[in-house]
C-alpha cells in the first residue's frame, strides 16, 4: 500500500530535525529544468504567474537563484519535516517515532510541482511551485504537461515494491491530476471526510485537509497495509460510513469536531 499527499505552501526551516540517513530526490534532473525556466522570470512575472505578493515573489526569485542540483544537509531539509500546512498539522510528524518514519519512507510519497515525487526523507530545498502553475515549458503550457507520465512511472515503481497494487489518494485534486490514473493499473482508494454542518454532511476544506494528515498518521502508526484496516480509522472523531462509501471511495463522517 502506498499513500500520497500534497505538499504545503508554507515551509518550516526552523524546527529541529532528528538525525536520520537522508535520501536523495530521484527526479532532480527534471527539477533543474524547471528551475532554469523560473530563473528567466522577473519578480513581476513570478508575482503574476503565482498570484502572490511582490514580497513573496522576491523571496521565490531568490530561492530559484540559490537552488542547487546537489542536495545536502546544509542547503536542504527532509521533505516530511519541511512542509507546514493543514495536512501536516494532522500528520504531526514531530511526534512520530524513528520506526514510524522508516515505515513512511516505504509507504508514503509527497507529490511536488518542482520535485515530482518525494519520499519523506528525501532532501529538498526551499521552493514554491504549485502543481497547477501555468509555467510554459518545452512540453507544453503547464506543469501537468511537463511531468507527463514521469510522476505516474515513479509511483508505479514504488507501488510494485509493495506488492499489493493499492494506492491511497490523500492528495488534493490539483496534485492528483498529475497522475495518469488509467496507466497506473492499481486499485485506488480515495478517503473522503465529511463534517456535520447545520444537519448536513459536507466537505469543509480546512477540516478535510487536516483529516488527510490524520489518516496519513493513522496509516503510519498502525502499519496499515490492508484496505479493510483503513475503515477502522477513528482519529479526530471520524467514523467510517459504509452506506455512503463505495469500493473505491471510503467516506468518513464526523458529528462533533474534536
Swiss-Prot record:
GO cellular component: cytosol
InterPro entries, sorted: YaaA
PANTHER family referenced in this protein's UniProt entry, alphabetically: PEROXIDE STRESS RESISTANCE PROTEIN YAAA, PEROXIDE STRESS RESPONSE PROTEIN YAAA
Origin: domain of life: Bacteria
Protein name as catalogued: UPF0246 protein HS_0482
UniProt feature coiled coil, ranges: none
Gene Ontology biological-process entries: response to hydroperoxide
Family indicated by similarity: Belongs to the UPF0246 family.
Matching HAMAP family: UPF0246
Species whose genome carries this gene: Histophilus somni (strain 129Pt) (Haemophilus somnus)
Amino acid at each position: 500500500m502506498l499513500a500520497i499527499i500534497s505538499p504545503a505552501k508554507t515551509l518550516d526551516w526552523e524546527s529541529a530535525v532528528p538525525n536520520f540517513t537522508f535520501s536523495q530526490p530521484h527526479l532532480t534532473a527534471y527539477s533543474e529544468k524547471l528551475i532554469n525556466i523560473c530563473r528567466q522570470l522577473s519578480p513581476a512575472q513570478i508575482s503574476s504567474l503565482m498570484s502572490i505578493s511582490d514580497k513573496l515573489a522576491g523571496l521565490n526569485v531568490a530561492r530559484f537563484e540559490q537552488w542547487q542540483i546537489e542536495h545536502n544537509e546544509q542547503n536542504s531539509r527532509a521533505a516530511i519535516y519541511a512542509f507546514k500546512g493543514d495536512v501536516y498539522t494532522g500528520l504531526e510528524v514531530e511526534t512520530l517515532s524513528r520506526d514510524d518514519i522508516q515505515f513512511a519512507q516505504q509507504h508514503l510519497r509527497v507529490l511536488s510541482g518542482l520535485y515530482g515525487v518525494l519520499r519523506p526523507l528525501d532532501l529538498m530545498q526551499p521552493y514554491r511551485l504549485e502543481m497547477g502553475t501555468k509555467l510554459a515549458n518545452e512540453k507544453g503550457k503547464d506543469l501537468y504537461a511537463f511531468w507527463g507520465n514521469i510522476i505516474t512511472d515513479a509511483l508505479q515503481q514504488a507501488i510494485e515494491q509493495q506488492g499489493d497494487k493499492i494506492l491511497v489518494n490523500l492528495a488534493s485534486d490539483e496534485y492528483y491530476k498529475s497522475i495518469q490514473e488509467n496507466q497506473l493499473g492499481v486499485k485506488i482508494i480515495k478517503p473522503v471526510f465529511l463534517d456535520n454542518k447545520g444537519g448536513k454532511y459536507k466537505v469543509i476544506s480546512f477540516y478535510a485537509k487536516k483529516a488527510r494528515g490524520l489518516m496519513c498518521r493513522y496509516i503510519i502508526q498502525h502499519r496499515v497495509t490492508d484496505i479493510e484496516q483503513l475503515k477502522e480509522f477513528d482519529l479526530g472523531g471520524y467514523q467510517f460510513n459504509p452506506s455512503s462509501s463505495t469500493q473505491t471511495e471510503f467516506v468518513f463522517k464526523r458529528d462533533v469536531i474534536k
